[in-house]
Amino acid sequence: MSDKPRRDTGSTGTGSGRSTGQSGSNRAVGAPNPGTGRSPNASTGGNRSAGNQAGNSGRPASAGRNQATTPAPNRNTPPAGARQGGAANARTGTPPVARGGGGGVTPPTGRGGNNPRAARNQPRSRQQPEEREREHVLRRPPPQPAARPVVRPRGPVALPPVMTVRELSEATGIGAADILKAMLKAGMLANINQQIDYETAALIMADFGIETTEDVPEQMAGIVEDVKEVLRAQPPEEMRPRPPVVTIMGHVDHGKTKLLDAIRSTRVAEGEAGGITQHIGAYQIEVNHRKITFLDTPGHEAFTAMRARGAQVTDIVVLVVAADDGVKPQTEEAIAHVKAAGVPMIVAINKIDLPTANPDRIKQQLANVGVIVEEYGGNVPCVHVSARQKINIDGLLEMILLVADLEDLRANPNAPAVGTIIEAKLDKSRGPVATVLIQNGTLHLEDNVLVGCVAGKIKSMFSDSGKRLRHAEPSTPVEIVGLEGVPQAGDILQVMDDLVVAREIALQRQRQQRAEVMAAAARGTSLEELFGKVKQGQVKELNLILKADVQGSLDAIAHLIEQLNQSQQAVQTRIIHRGVGAITEGDVNLALASHAIIIGFNARPDPAARRHAEQHGIDIRFYNIIYQLQDDLKKAMAGMLAPTVKEVVEGYAEVRNTFRLPTREVVAGVYVSDGKITRTGQNVRVLRRGVVIHDGKISSLKRFKDDVREVTAGYECGLIVEGFNDIEVGDALEFYRQETVAASL
């Protein structure tokens, strides 16, 4: 340290090794402000050029010198003025620089300037921790909402006709996962967004003890589901006689279309492809000032479903049988459909003009399949005709009118129209076109209609001959144009006041139809389900459809079922149709309509029948041994009786020692005298002097401190009886298993 006086610093700074060039200035740049001890440059935080300080002030400045930005000092750094002459230098004793003296000063050292070490020693920005905190908050997962408490309703819950599993969960308070588990137990595989119908929802909610009611929308209240109910609801004074609707059925090439052609005196048969009717045609004729409507259902087996629909809208069935060919499989199938529909039948024995015709043989064959004509003491009229020669056609028409008079067919022509779709198609030029049979009321042009899942407005109507119509009365078949979609055959047409309401109902029905199809595919009609309904008293009769490889097998199965019916009276099994050959789509349709089970004895379904059965959930059982069929029928019928619980004793042991564990449980050291001990699946009885003092389960089974699953006779082991600590030496143990055995007839 030198005691020499400090030399003038007017031209050179000492702190940074850089010349300030501010000689003659009134105030040294970098000097501390009075009372603050802080450099002006430190407070501004900007880059200041000394040359900008000159000018009129008379303070020369060094051109282009940049002052380094100096942040505020931290608490460990002394004030800048202490190092720049704001106070006496503690090391040299140099007095502070005078405010008015000329000469420069040493700039701040250690912080600022272009000193790289000073830049490294600067404190971090105060905003960096805040930014890190914000980033942490953004990365933090959002809080999960609190679980909503499950509130189960006290009274019945109103449910719509169709809903999703999620909507059912929200309406009832039952978790969607619990509903899906219950549906899985019931044999229905679903997801949370799958639509289910009300019947399925009510069945599932019954398992949870929740009562439900169906909430039918107001616009659905007046919707027609059954035409017969509409006819019953009509005022008797408004009812008027209507023409009969006649369906022609029979085996392929037995002359059905030619018979209808002879009746209408047209050449319809020549226009058919291959001589086989390809669609359901509806025609109306006039006889003795009275009208008769005919439905020509195809006789080929590939169109069995269309024939079934024809039987549902008909009043009278004319069964055509060729006099030279006899009763065929399609003939028997048509008879089964007629019986299932419950409509009167007229037998028309055709081709009597042929030399090989034998009407008596035909009548005998019909009697063998359950159709007894009037000549044989039955109630089925029989008419001999020849479609080719037009023999006795008038006699057949008179018989149809006679049967119609006996049936007293009536309808109300003044009511809004209600009918059934016979067929529908998409025409390239006209759009959706449907053939409808009016069954009650009168259909007019510009009527708003609802047809199944389709709505629309009647834009045009045509008769069977192609004539434009303005209205159609009961029993009249018409072709209508104006629907917004193609309906399904068998859908009910109903006149609506508002087209908007009709569209809403059509959309609702589309949802319901999808739900029903999915539910039917998941649930189906199985043998176990039918017997479950029998057990609950819902079904008193079991319907069966039998198909076999030979007639002898059919007779043997029929005799077997007759014996089962005689052995018990609780449930009667009825064979609604039987035949020889493969299981057809017609068999599936009949089973679907009559809730029947199909039994194939050495008979398999064709591909179309298999797909149809899978789509609608129809149960088809296959057998090749008649005793297996007998056993299954007996087991299914026995399922109506309460099952019995049978005990099977599997082992005995005696207690030879006891040990008490720190958990206060008692370990019994036993010797297995007979049978075996199993850790799971067995119950144990503790007997003391022959009296049962406890009945429970085994919670632990060990040998030499090792857990074992089973101990056989002749070995010792240790065990703990669950929930029982009073076991004593000398007690006898009996190990048994419970088995549920179905009751037998």
From Swiss-Prot:
Residues 386-388 are annotated as: G5. Residues 275-279 are annotated as: G2. Residues 36-56 have a biased composition (Polar residues). It comes from the Bacteria. Residues 127-138 have a biased composition (Basic and acidic residues). This is Translation initiation factor IF-2. Residues 99-113 have a biased composition (Gly residues).
